[in-house]
Amino acid sequence: MKPNSFIKPLLYKKHAQPICWIDDSTLIYYFFGQFISFNIETKNESVVGNIKLSLKEKLLSFFSFTRRLFRLYVFSPIFNRQKHEIVFSFNGYFCSFNLKTKEFFREQKFGHCARRVLSICLCKDGDVYYGEYPTINDNSDVCIYKRNNDKEHVVVYRFKSGDIRHIHYICEYNNDLFCFTGDEDNETKVLRFINKNFDNEPDYLLSGSQNYRTCVGVFNNNSLFYLTDNPYFENGLYSYNLKSQLVERLFCVEGSVIYGLHSDNKLFFSTSVEYNLCKDKNNKNVRIKIDGKNGGIRSNQSILYCFDFKKSQLKVLNKIKKDIFSIKYFGIGTFMFTCNNSKKYLATFTYALNRNESLLIYDIEED
């Protein structure tokens, strides 16, 4: 990576949503129902498969305006290299596509009228875990699901109604499964299921504060590094030591963080431009102006960051302003990422920003 903070993208490709890297130079991206293989260096590309869109999905996917309104994108993709399989959420379903057999399945419809999930975790044994992200509060349990090698989906753990609102993130570390929940203080938890044993109650590592509300976390040297998703107070990059149980804020950032990518000794992430909030005297949410001083959203730009674990250094790589369209209907402004990394390149997707629906490729290879 170049020593200066801001880096200019190597290339720009409109409407191409990056999904995963097949190798360090070959990217799979999604566009209008197609998975397309694109070699960054030769510029060769070819269609490798299709999502079977319904007539309604085809019509709504045709225009960027309606794609955004109905969230017709690939969310939370995971690539299983051994099986040549991409699993992801799309339009209210847990889906899978096999690059080798070209088979596409809508395996499981999400409950609670959910359009997507925020996190899918592929474990070392091939099992997949994901948590529900309800769109509506229907007074039912919010669940963690396990999807096995036979594509069977079963509930492994239930949060009772009213306990949490969303499951933000799930990941594996040392054979344990970690679950991160939100949104309000009493709903914000970081849990550990030891050896993925769901018969016993999980360990509660952190809970009860917006400082523990996160959608992006990475384990490094027995510490959890995580970014906060906090619309009320200043956001930051934190570390939590699993042994000492000490929490330390390492850096402040300009907004809530929902998307990130762990790449070797680096963590790439982006801030989001969403509603900036405070609580009134009745503990109700009140929207406030983005002024750089109050609330959790301190900038009307989405900022692309890189954190270097070895150097304990944070760099700003790019900034793009949120577009003029409604957050409620057309989404928060942010950069999205692939599900895995290339040692040479970083692929990002601009969402609800002034340069919208754009694949941006950056050179991140060390000098």
PLM regions and their residue ranges:
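Recurrent small/Gly-Pro-centered beta-turn motifs in extracellular repeat architectures
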Residues: 30-32, 88-91, 130-134, 179-183, ...
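Asp-box/WD-like beta-propeller blade repeats and closely related beta-sheet repeat scaffolds
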Residues: 99-123, 131, 139, 154-159
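Repeated scaffold domains used in trafficking and secretory/extracellular systems
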Residues: 12-24, 57-81, 112-122, 163-169, ...
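Blade-level signature of beta-propeller repeat domains, shared across WD40, Kelch, NHL, RCC1
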Residues: 332-367
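Structural motif
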Residues: 33-37, 93-96, 137-145, 185-192, ...
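A short beta-strand motif characteristic of beta-propeller blades
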Residues: 6-11, 46-48, 59-68, 103-111, ...
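Entry beta-strands of beta-propeller and related beta-repeat scaffolds
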Residues: 25-27, 84-87, 126-130, 176-178, ...
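Loop/turn-rich, solvent-exposed surfaces of beta-rich toroidal or solenoidal domains
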Residues: 223-235, 251-325, 329-333
